[in-house]
C-alpha cells in the first residue's frame, strides 16, 4: 500500500477562471474539470494528472462567505518546480511580485501573492 498523499487543496477565489489561467501559465497545469459547485457556486480543478487545486467561488461572483474568507487558516500553497528561474520569470511576466527569496539546504525558493491575496511558495530542489 502506498503512503497517503494530498490529492487536492480547495481554495476560495473571486474569479476561478482568472486564477486557473494564472496557474496554467505559471506552472504548465491544465484544467481537469470545471462545473457547478455547492451553494450555487462554480469550481475549476486545475493541476496535473496526479494532483490539483480546486478553485471555488460562491453563487454571487466576488462574494465569498465569511467561513471561506481567504487566509484563514491557510498560510500558503507550496509548488515544487524543476526550473525556479523560469517560473519566476513567468510570475513577473504575469504582473506579480516575487519576494522572500532564499537559498537553503536542500533547495531554493521564493513567494508571491495572487490577485486574491493567496500566498504561494515556489521551491526547487534541482
PLM region spans:
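Mid-chain, well-packed structural core segment of small domains
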Residues: 70-91
Amino acid at each position: 500500500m502506498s503512503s497517503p498523499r494530498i490529492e487536492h487543496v480547495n481554495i476560495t477565489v473571486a474569479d476561478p477562471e482568472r486564477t486557473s489561467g494564472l496557474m496554467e501559465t505559471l506552472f504548465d497545469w491544465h484544467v481537469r474539470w470545471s462545473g457547478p459547485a455547492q451553494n450555487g457556486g462554480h469550481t475549476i480543478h486545475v493541476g496535473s494528472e496526479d494532483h490539483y487545486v480546486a478553485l471555488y467561488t460562491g453563487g454571487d461572483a466576488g462574494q465569498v462567505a465569511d467561513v471561506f474568507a481567504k487566509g484563514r487558516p491557510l498560510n500558503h500553497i507550496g509548488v515544487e518546480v524543476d526550473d525556479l528561474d523560469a517560473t519566476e520569470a513567468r510570475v513577473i511576466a504575469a504582473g506579480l511580485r516575487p519576494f522572500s527569496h532564499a537559498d537553503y539546504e536542500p533547495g531554493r525558493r521564493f513567494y508571491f501573492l495572487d490577485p486574491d491575496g493567496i500566498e504561494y511558495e515556489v521551491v526547487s530542489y534541482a
